[in-house]
């Protein structure tokens, strides 16, 4: 709908002389706005053969973590996990620099025709953030309408935002060098003013992950777990959550015909159970096929929004083309997936917590049941590894340790998330499992068929009745038999012709875990957890 010019007062944010406010536009209006004649550059959307619109985000095909800042003031000084306290993206900004950036964005938005989209972040009424997005660009309004929870007309009647996001993608900061910033682009947060500013980057994910970072600030301080995970629920109301970094299988494994999807990326866990932060999904589309991922493929239709996908003049899509980026994406409202929890994306307490890792070293077992102490250790470690090509063409593993499986989005110290998750799991009697979707001694990746059989065994409880053995160095308890899984792969040592090769690799990986975890040993709790990790 188009709001009367004065019905939403944007001057309270420093935006003046607004030409017109297009308030909470319908999908029909957004479609016509983002594809209308006369649009140029990154404003322009292209209609594809599947009915979804495709947009180009320019050189910004992913987040810009080096351009992320939080104003250091009385609110944040003693709570935020600052980049000078540990390796993270929470760089401090002065209030003076903030004022300058805010002036740039409000000047850019003043005098323009603007889209204002009011949303909820969080499916729990008591703790959700009411987030208002202000942008010049129709498809950016479309993106947040897809990704956040869409309020009803009744909920909009007395809507007062808790947080405001001003997207000034068309402005840059020429004074960045003298201000000691990383570049002319910026993604900045002020927790006193409760505003996020975006400048220079057109990437839609900055709005999504920006609010995730804010939920990661507010919820743990209230004793609520804030998690980078997918979640689903079975017919008996048994909730499962899947932690994992990009490429480990979060979205694929939580999309299960036997279970209803709660959400695919961001969740909270409070006194009532697990709830989604979002109203949509943001899926990778590189090499997407209808055969391999039918749910995601079928979600790409009218109202979905593709980003940086190769589309020809006739609207034909080439999902295999990575010439623009590997990080091609689609956002769509969650109701584009059939098998979802309705009407609200929430369910009861989790009974099964799964940590997904893709171990390219070929060391970790396909599955291990974790003790409470191991759960905290592996959660804080947040390990995965990728195979990266070297100059000589040899592929060698590159380890990634990302605390809580989402260090890029943590606003507080990682131990705060670990403590809250530990309490939630303890109260619910939940059990944790480490599931490796990576490689073993055969040089091949563990098949998705085997991994799905493992997930089934975790969810139906049969894994808990299996006879087990212990993998050395890591002291992980692994089952000897799981239905549907070749028995010899469950102990990774069996996948090597020469078990001493596994030993050497295991020692190497164990050392990497130990070295990474050293940063947590500055507290008594961290020191106590060392015994739960690999022992050399």
Swiss-Prot record:
The terms under GO molecular function for this entry are: ATP binding; metal ion binding; phosphoenolpyruvate carboxykinase (ATP) activity
Binding-site residues for substrate, renumbered to this chain = 63, 203, 209, 329
Q: Which cofactors are reported in the record for this sequence?
A: Mn(2+)
- Location relative to the cell: Cytoplasm
* Cofactor: binding comment: Binds 1 Mn(2+) ion per subunit.
Task: Name the EC number(s).
Answer: 4.1.1.49
Q: Name one GO biological process term.
A: gluconeogenesis
Principal place of residence: cytoplasm
Biological pathway:
Carbohydrate biosynthesis; gluconeogenesis
Look up the record and report any one GO term of the cellular component aspect. Answer: cytosol
Q: What does the entry list as the binding residues for ATP?
A: 209, 228, 244-252, 293, 329, 445-446, 451
Q: Which UniProt keywords apply?
A: ATP-binding, Cytoplasm, Decarboxylase, Gluconeogenesis, Lyase, Manganese, Metal-binding, Nucleotide-binding
Q: Show the InterPro entries listed in the entry.
A: PEP_carboxykinase_ATP, PEP_carboxykinase_C, PEP_carboxykinase_N, PEPCK_ATP_CS
Which superkingdom, per the lineage? Bacteria
Chemical reaction(s) catalysed: oxaloacetate + ATP = phosphoenolpyruvate + ADP + CO2
Record: residues binding Mn(2+): 209, 228, 265
The similarity comment for this entry is:
Belongs to the phosphoenolpyruvate carboxykinase (ATP) family.
Subunit-structure text: Monomer.
Matching PANTHER family, A to Z? Answer: PHOSPHOENOLPYRUVATE CARBOXYKINASE (ATP), PHOSPHOENOLPYRUVATE CARBOXYKINASE ATP
Task: Tell me, in a sentence or two, what this protein's role is.
Answer: Involved in the gluconeogenesis. Catalyzes the conversion of oxaloacetate (OAA) to phosphoenolpyruvate (PEP) through direct phosphoryl transfer between the nucleoside triphosphate and OAA.
Name listed for the protein in its UniProt record: Phosphoenolpyruvate carboxykinase (ATP)
